[in-house]
Amino acid sequence: MGDMTNSDFYSKNQRNESSHGGEFGCSMEELRSLMELRGTEAVVKIKETYGDTESICRRLKTSPVEGLPGTAPDLEKRKQIFGQNFIPPKKPKTFLQLVWEALQDVTLIILEIAAIISLGLSFYHPPGESNEGCATAQGGAEDEGEAEAGWIEGAAILLSVICVVLVTAFNDWSKEKQFRGLQSRIEQEQKFTVVRAGQVVQIPVAEIVVGDIAQIKYGDLLPADGLFIQGNDLKIDESSLTGESDQVRKSVDKDPMLLSGTHVMEGSGRMVVTAVGVNSQTGIIFTLLGAGGEEEEKKDKKGVKKGDGLQLPAADGAAPANAAGSANASLVNGKMQDGSADSSQSKAKQQDGAAAMEMQPLKSAEGGDADDKKKANMHKKEKSVLQGKLTKLAVQIGKAGLVMSAITVIILVLYFTVDTFVVNKKPWLTECTPVYVQYFVKFFIIGVTVLVVAVPEGLPLAVTISLAYSVKKMMKDNNLVRHLDACETMGNATAICSDKTGTLTTNRMTVVQAYVGDVHYKEIPDPSSINAKTLELLVNAIAINSAYTTKILPPEKEGALPRQVGNKTECGLLGFVLDLRQDYEPVRSQMPEEKLYKVYTFNSVRKSMSTVIKMPDESFRMYSKGASEIVLKKCCKILSGAGEPRVFRPRDRDEMVKKVIEPMACDGLRTICVAYRDFPSSPEPDWDNENDILNELTCICVVGIEDPVRPEVPEAIRKCQRAGITVRMVTGDNINTARAIAIKCGIIHPGEDFLCLEGKEFNRRIRNEKGEIEQERIDKIWPKLRVLARSSPTDKHTLVKGIIDSTHTEQRQVVAVTGDGTNDGPALKKADVGFAMGIAGTDVAKEASDIILTDDNFSSIVKAVMWGRNVYDSISKFLQFQLTVNVVAVIVAFTGACITQDSPLKAVQMLWVNLIMDTFASLALATEPPTETLLLRKPYGRNKPLISRTMMKNILGHAVYQLTLIFTLLFVGEKMFQIDSGRNAPLHSPPSEHYTIIFNTFVMMQLFNEINARKIHGERNVFDGIFRNPIFCTIVLGTFAIQIVIVQFGGKPFSCSPLQLDQWMWCIFIGLGELVWGQVIATIPTSRLKFLKEAGRLTQKEEIPEEELNEDVEEIDHAERELRRGQILWFRGLNRIQTQIRVVKAFRSSLYEGLEKPESRTSIHNFMAHPEFRIEDSQPHIPLIDDTDLEEDAALKQNSSPPSSLNKNNSAIDSGINLTTDTSKSATSSSPGSPIHSLETSL
């Protein structure tokens, strides 16, 4: 292995070498084509062309043991010849493209057309213009100045449209910039372990080069293609590339091909990297799918943006912004536009789809499948709670606005026609046609104006701004948000199911008690008190039977604790060896990893890890370790104080459990048993017969490992409980350990009525005689359940699903889950919000999550709750403000137009009002910082309407005040101010003071009402904390300043006539009245106003159709996109699509239905079945025959059958998430590293 440039080798293989001009023994193309082969085909090819994997290492000038030398010139050369492990992201949209997108907005287009017609007509002077018949219709002769007004109005509308477009585009641009920043942050955080110059180092995924020796372990997502060179029991889930859900066992002689984007489900090993970036299998797929991204762009621009329309659902049902779609567009005619929807969302739509993938350094390629990913995002959850409510509300408002504007136009046209041609009996003269048309255009503009004000296009903007602002700030609080909507959902959380290890505890394991040689030591024993033979066995057992990647390194700083690298439980055991003043390194160098004869890696069926070595006398010895209650059952002997094995009977075991294990557990310790067994050299045992091998062990010792509770956790849990959130602990530890820790954390308090169950008991209680899970049974348990111990990932998933699906309480539950192991994927996906651990979490867990806790700390979850509630409140504040403006403006424009034949608020003024109430108000109200007081109230829950009765009271109360004053001004204002009336003015008359006062008063009332809108729970002090929000103050003052300019100098474009000081004072005084009136409204008890209805409530049934529709559209979209791409991956693509469609259908039927014999193990099943060797996970995983196994197949057989009754109201959720249960294979497989995918998609 050692000599990399082996001369014999070269001479022998000269013929193969001659064709390579490069410095390496094989070219990029050869390696690339080699990696496209599978199984035996690949083995044959390697043998024929290269000899074996070692020769490939030599050609690549690398050593399987030492790795690359790691010198800068060498790495650089490799990058040049073989490429970098990076798939270039798609170029961000330019500002102009964003402007173009913003222009796609339907209402804006209508306004532009109307303005252009109006402009055109104002320049067209027909010969009959002086005709008297027309003149009457025009309301008398015009002077020169008035004739100009026609074009001024048209130009002003165009100008304001440009303003709106620029503001929208700027918002999108800054948002996109922010997310790219977030993306690069996520990229940097992803590292992989490689061997360089004999040292094991972690390097960013983008730095991996061809020839690197990468160490792979359970839970990894492979960042590049490579050849397996050595390892134990390695099983890979390749479903992300092949669509096959079975795990593939890898071995040097049968199938050494390891592909990027696939998951390590079990075992560990080393591989030599053979292809990176665009040349890896995933990279090739992305390149094909993206077709360089360019074609996609062109295609998307054609026609009705077919892609966009279809992809909208794909952009994550949960995307707040695309919630109200691009509100105006989507609302006006249901046609989804990119318009004012976030560009980053539309960008994500194109990229995230099977389109030009926005690929981060390979990690996102690791994603395997873009489409799987997209699918996963889309079905991630039922629509984000808030978003579902917003969409519904926005659609309702949009429809109402459309009806109102249509009626306005019809009434105006009828009134004009009847008045002109019937009452005044005017004939229709051809020369008058342009004049009449001008009238109709004016009416049309008024109609569109009503619509513009009615449609709340600020909603998606408010949501986006609020979320983007929160996400940015949450990064400082150690919450890396991957799906934007998760941030808002978190505010509604009613339950948190948390892991113990690493989240509630520090995940720094130390052995504090031990039972060795018949003595129970309450602290680390002195090595001299342990028999030398026993001590040697103990050191060998721990050193050899632990992953060789697990190490204890010297502390980084003077006086700090030693660094623990690798599996924390094993670190604790190695620390124990060091505490016994022994050294594990010499043992490992004597018995290197390559010499290990057989390794039974930890998995959830074995719940232990065992390693077989060959002794000098050719016999075999197996070392074993695992959860004490599991391993002790397999022991028939135990080492005595003299170091001799003596018989260990079941009754001895029971006594040991009582006297040693239970007391340790009650101290909150995890107990691990270390054992061994000797085998004769002949006959050689049948190593595949595990039941015989992993039996008749001899116990060496039992140790108690402490994992202390994080100091800040009890306070954080107290805050959650005060905020009405129930915290449950789900752990693999035994019940006594779990209960002890739960009491320390404050999850349970002695004397309370609560349940602590073990996984087995939990399953017994929730299943009927047939072994099926029943929702009613779960409903009896979950309200009191606080600790679920010895639980398998399936149990965790079952619990989360049970709580989410429960209709047992009035408020449906919103559940957050934390997880770090690969097997937590399903539960993380099922939960409303999944938190993955940034430090201890596996790639798979991170990929399945919505938020990554960068410090693995539970108290960061409390911050997320605070931010989430703040988002919800910000949006409610904005709604309260916006709806008041909407109601008033629409009624004023409608009534005014119908009674006076002209809207008191002109088109350009309305656009200005629209700008302040939408864009500026959303900025002002959506950026309120959160306060601790948010944690003093109960969560809203899933069914709470968006607009509470208090808010409805505020909206109607303020609308009544505003309408009363505006109509008073409209009909008697001219008498009050002794000015000319502005009613019934002729077509191009100059702006009147009368209407200017109405406009100014209207804006002043909105400004002061914006201050009222800061409080939505009926608080009296609306100024509380106003100076903590500089953005709010700036916007209110800025709007006021611009209003002065518009009124005093706006002139004809804004239809404004300058006002005198006393008129200004009246306008401001009426505006200030809003604040006083606000106090009056606050005094009225909401409970008395029974007639008030809430709005924006989401009933469970409404969650369904949208989602199912999404699925269908999504499938069509997939297929279309896939089939249009190059033929090379035709079959693979097809295969993948079929799998996905199958999966969607399969999981649409209830998760726990149909328990037929599985025909294949779905990957999620395996997924759940293999925790890392962390004993907290050494769960008695009930052999997972129950649910997940069968879902795919069982459901396939019954995909026509309706979902089980317990899910009737929830099939949306089910289809969404059960899909995700399986997408743990696809979604998780799909770009782990690219949370940003998901992030953008969900924007």
Swiss-Prot record:
Chain residue ranges for the region called Disordered: 1-24, 296-382, 1194-1243
Annotated spans, Calmodulin-binding subdomain A: 1123-1140
Alphabetical list of InterPro entries matching this protein: ATP_Ca_trans_C, ATPase_P-typ_cation-transptr_C, ATPase_P-typ_cation-transptr_N, ATPase_P-typ_cyto_dom_N, ATPase_P-typ_P_site, ATPase_P-typ_TM_dom_sf, ATPase_P-typ_transduc_dom_A_sf, HAD-like_sf
Residue ranges annotated as Cytoplasmic topological domain: 1-94, 174-390, 462-875, 927-946, 1010-1028, 1083-1243
Binding residues annotated for Mg(2+), in chain numbering: D820, D824
Function: ATP-driven Ca(2+) ion pump involved in the maintenance of basal intracellular Ca(2+) levels in specialized cells of cerebellar circuit and vestibular and cochlear systems. Uses ATP as an energy source to transport cytosolic Ca(2+) ions across the plasma membrane to the extracellular compartment. Has fast activation and Ca(2+) clearance rate suited to control fast neuronal Ca(2+) dynamics. At parallel fiber to Purkinje neuron synapse, mediates presynaptic Ca(2+) efflux in response to climbing fiber-induced Ca(2+) rise.
Name the UniProt record assigns to this protein: Plasma membrane calcium-transporting ATPase 2
Organism: Rattus norvegicus
